[in-house]
Structures are given as structure tokens and as C-alpha cells.
A protein has these predicted regions:
Chain A
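Conserved ABC ATPase "signature" region
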Residues: 111-129
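A short, proline-enriched helix->beta-strand linker immediately N-terminal to the Walker B motif
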Residues: 153-157
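Conserved ABC ATPase signature
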Residues: 134-138, 142
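Helix-to-loop junction immediately C-terminal to a conserved catalytic motif
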Residues: 48
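Conserved ABC transporter NBD signature motif
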Residues: 56-65
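Catalytic Walker B motif of ABC-type/P-loop ATPase nucleotide-binding domains
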Residues: 159-162
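Helix N-cap at the start of a conserved alpha-helix in ABC-type nucleotide-binding domains
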Residues: 170-172
Length: 251, 242
């Protein structure tokens, strides 16, 4: 479980996050949603420690990550897997080396065990016979899968995904979403996904946190998304025609 | 001054939260091949022609019959070892290796590869930059030695083939009044230049923000700043050590 307490972050005079609190539950896909520029990615970066919040704390299973010393931060980070927007695969390494990288750095596993683990993770994300390919030789969707394989290779307790569907076709997006949800349930991980894709929200949104202009305006699940009673939230959700049709049918 | 302070802090961050020695050993070897071995042919070619041109021009300007011909190779020796090999090759090194370092790190920054390392709990400056600086400091003096040898060979071949100087005169000139301290000075300079080029280029690349355009700007800034730093340090080292 991850808990965020009163997180605020500004860049110069511009307030990006304003007093945001919330909880991300274990074994569920927790979504941070909102329009572009509302601070979703900044919040994610504050949670994983890529940015230091101006105020507030982040707790990973009751461990205060924000105020932790370097050793504890390092310990928590070893339990984190992250899928970046563009995959963030290392250009100079092939697929196998990319997935193996966290094991090389963070463990003392023998090579054959590492290879077994890498092959298991690649198979788990539906990739076979791509071990020796370079990132430039595979498609965007495959890069995302390799990114997921790398994120889960070290058995993380926490999985973070920054806009996992960006740049993907709708069909591949659904495959990636399903994969994230399956992995979350299968390995009982606390997963946090940043997205503004309503298909993802309706597909895998087990716990949803809605940001609007740097503030948390709404929290709920995909089941009570239709009756939030909040104009800003409805404006975001029902911009999509399919969502409007869905609401009309529900009414 | 703010930029300089940031640079000093960047250098300080290279030595905290380091990985295992084996990790650095492997990365440094890879960088040595990338930086040193792959630059050797260019350095050899450039220095060969620098030596050749220096010989031709020195011979052209020595018109007095009172000056012995072996002075040509003496001048070539001093120019090559003192300035051409360490300093001019440093400018070429900044253009080839420095821009490549800045471009590589800049691309890693904008594609979130550096963030990926940080999320894994790896000190990205130490992991990515320290091997580059160590490899540079190890390999650049070797490149300078190669440049010195190739420069003198170029001078010898062109000088003797054009008849500007006989082989015996050229070798005599090379050995005449030779001061071994010149080599110490050239190698000291090369270590300082290697450190400056690799650290400044890495610094510029590491802090790239934006997109592909900014990566190009970082690469250009890396080369220009490195070359200015090299030339300034060249002057101060000459004042200090000669």
C-alpha cells in the first residue's frame, strides 16, 4: 500500500500540486487521471522520488520515503518497478540485457538464473524470440512490453506506469492495460498508472484519483464514475463520445 | 558562477552511492574502447598530416644558409610534442568524443533512460559519467603519445621524400638538445585536458532539457565550452609548469 499525505510541489511561482492526499491499494490498479498539464506525471515523480515534494510525505507500506535516509530510499527503490512513457529502454543494450539490467545491478544471482528469470518475464508479457533484438528494431507496443518485463523482473512490490498507452493503437493499448492488470493481480503488486485514456479508466480503473489544476477533486472506482456529480470531472470523462453514449444508456 | 557551482556539485555527485568495482571495471573498459580505440585512426591521420605540414612550412621559412637543416626537425619535435599533439588533438577529441558524450547523455535524459536508472536506485551520474571520465583520463594520454609519434613520422617522411632534409639530419635534429621534461609536460596537459573535456561534455549532456533540438544544442555547447576550457588551462599550465 502506498499513502501520500498533503503533497505539494511548485516550480518557481507555478503551483503544480496543491495538498494532495490519497491511498493506493495493494493488489489493485490505482489510476491517477486528469487532463494534460494537471500534474499527474509530477505527482508520480514525487511518489517514486524523482522529484522532491515541497511539502508532504509518501509512505510505502508505512515507511516514510520522503524523509528516509539514503539507505532506506535505496531499499524501497529496489522494490519499485516503473514503466516509462516511451519505454525508456537502454539504446545500447538488447532486449535481454535491458530486462536483465535490474538483476545485474541489484542482485548477485548467477547468470543462468538471471536468464531463466528474463525469459519468464518476456514470456509473461507475450514476447518470444526477441531477446537479441535492439530497442530500435522493435515496435512501440513491444517496447512497452519489454519495459513491463524490466519493471517486474526483480519481483517489485510497487509498479508505476506513466501513460502506458501513449503512442499505441487502441488494440495494443487494451493488451497493455490488460497485461498491467493481470500482473498486478497475479503478483499482488501495488500498481499506480498515470493516464488520460478513458478506455484505460473504464477497463482497469479499480481505484481512481482525479486531478484538476493540481488538486485532487475526486476519488472512486470505475463503477461510480457515472454519478460523480462534479462538473470538472464530468467534463473530463464525458468529452469522449463513447462515454457520453454509455451515460445516456445508463440513464 | 551558478553554472560553475552546479558543475562542481555534479563532480561531487560522481563519488556518492557508487556501484560495485566490477560494474565500473566493465563500463570503463567499454568506454576505453569507445573513446580510445575508436579515436586512434582519426588521431593518427590528423597528427601525421600536422607533422608533415609543420615540416614543409618550417623548411619553407628557413631560407638562411646559416641555419642548419636539422633545425627543421628540432622545430617539428618541439611543436608536435609541446603543442600540436596535446592541444590540437584535444580540440579534435572534444569535437569527436565530447560531442558524442553530450549527445548520448542528452538523449538518455530526454528519453527518460536516466530517470529509469534513478528509479532503480542507481546513482546515474556515477554510473554513467564516472567511467567516461576515468576512461578519458586513461586513454587520452595514450592518444597524445600516438599523435606525437605519428606527427614525427609524418614530418620525417615528408621532409625526406621532398628533399627538405636528409634522414640523418632529421634524426639528428630530433635528438639534438632534447629535454625529456617536454614529455612529462605534454602528458600532464593531456590528463588535465581529458578530464576537462569528458567532465564538461558529460555535464552539458546530463542536464539537457527538452527534445532533439536541445540535444544538438548541448552537444555544441559541450564542444565550445570544452575547447575554451582546454585553451585556458593550456595557458595556465604553460605558465605554471614551464
Amino acid at each position: 500500500m502506498i499513502k501520500i499525505n498533503h503533497i505539494s510541489k511548485s516550480f518557481g511561482d507555478k503551483v503544480i500540486l496543491n495538498n494532495i492526499s490519497g491511498e493506493f491499494e495493494k493488489g489493485k490498479t490505482n489510476l491517477i487521471i486528469g487532463s494534460s498539464g494537471t500534474g499527474k506525471s509530477v505527482l508520480l515523480k514525487c511518489i517514486v522520488g524523482l522529484l522532491q515534494p515541497d511539502e508532504g510525505n509518501v509512505f510505502f507500506d508505512f515507511r516514510n520515503f520522503t524523509e528516509a535516509d539514503k539507505e532506506m530510499k535505496s531499499e524501497v527503490r529496489r522494490e519499485i518497478g516503473m514503466l516509462f512513457q516511451g519505454g525508456a529502454l537502454f539504446d545500447s543494450k538488447n532486449v535481454e540485457q535491458n530486462v536483465m539490467f535490474p538483476l545485474d545491478i541489484l542482485t548477485k544471482m548467477p547468470l543462468n538464473e538471471k536468464l531463466d528469470r528474463v525469459n519468464f518475464c518476456l514470456q509473461r508479457v507475450g514476447l518470444e524470440n526477441v531477446n537479441k533484438k535492439m530497442p530500435s528494431e522493435i515496435s512501440g507496443g513491444m517496447k512497452k512490453r519489454v519495459g513491463i518485463a524490466r519493471a517486474i523482473v526483480n519481483n517489485p512490490n510497487y509498479l508505476f506506469c506513466d501513460e502506458p498507452n501513449s503512442g499505441l493503437d487502441p488494440q495494443t493499448s487494451i493488451v497493455i492495460d490488460d497485461l498491467i492488470q493481470e500482473i498486478t493481480h497475479e503478483f499482488n503488486i501495488t500498481t499506480v498508472v498515470v493516464t488520460h485514456d478513458m478506455n484505460s479508466v473504464m477497463g482497469i480503473g479499480e481505484n481512481i484519483l482525479f486531478l484538476y489544476k493540481g488538486k485532487k477533486l475526486w476519488e472512486g472506482t470505475k463503477d461510480n464514475i457515472m454519478n460523480s456529480g462534479m462538473k470538472e470531472f464530468d467534463d473530463f470523462v464525458f468529452t469522449n463520445k463513447a462515454m457520453r453514449n454509455l451515460r445516456e444508456r445508463a440513464v | 558562477m551558478k553554472e560553475f557551482g552546479k558543475y562542481v556539485m555534479f563532480l561531487g555527485s560522481l563519488f556518492v552511492r557508487r556501484e560495485t568495482f566490477a560494474t565500473y571495471y566493465k563500463l570503463t573498459l567499454e568506454e576505453c574502447i569507445q573513446i580510445g580505440v575508436k579515436s586512434a585512426s582519426l588521431v593518427a591521420l590528423v597528427s601525421f598530416f600536422m607533422g608533415a605540414v609543420t615540416t614543409v612550412q618550417t623548411a619553407y621559412n628557413m631560407v638562411s644558409p646559416l641555419i642548419p637543416r636539422f633545425v627543421i626537425s628540432q622545430v617539428v619535435r618541439e611543436m608536435t610534442l609541446l603543442e600540436l599533439a596535446p592541444t590540437i588533438i584535444a580540440v579534435i577529441y572534444a569535437g569527436k568524443v565530447g560531442s558524442s558524450m553530450a549527445g548520448g547523455l542528452g538523449t538518455m535524459r530526454i528519453t527518460e533512460q536516466i530517470d529509469a536508472l534513478e528509479v532503480m536506485g542507481i546513482n546515474s551520474t556515477s554510473y554513467l559519467v564516472l567511467p567516461k571520465i576515468v576512461a578519458s583520463v586513461l586513454m587520452y594520454p595514450l592518444l597524445v603519445i600516438l599523435a606525437g609519434v605519428c606527427g614525427l613520422v609524418g614530418g620525417y617522411l615528408v621532409g625526406t621524400l621532398t628533399g627538405a632534409v636528409t634522414p640523418t639530419e632529421f634524426v639528428y635534429g630530433l635528438r639534438y638538445n632534447y629535454n625529456p621534461y617536454v614529455i612529462t609536460f605534454a602528458l600532464t596537459k593531456s590528463i588535465v585536458f581529458a578530464f576537462l573535456i569528458s567532465s564538461i561534455s558529460s555535464f552539458k549532456g546530463y542536464y539537457t532539457q527538452g527534445g532533439a533540438l536541445e540535444v544538438g544544442i548541448s552537444s555544441t555547447a559541450a564542444v565550445t565550452t570544452s575547447v575554451i576550457a582546454v585553451l585556458l588551462s593550456d595557458y595556465f599550465l604553460a605558465q605554471l609548469l614551464l
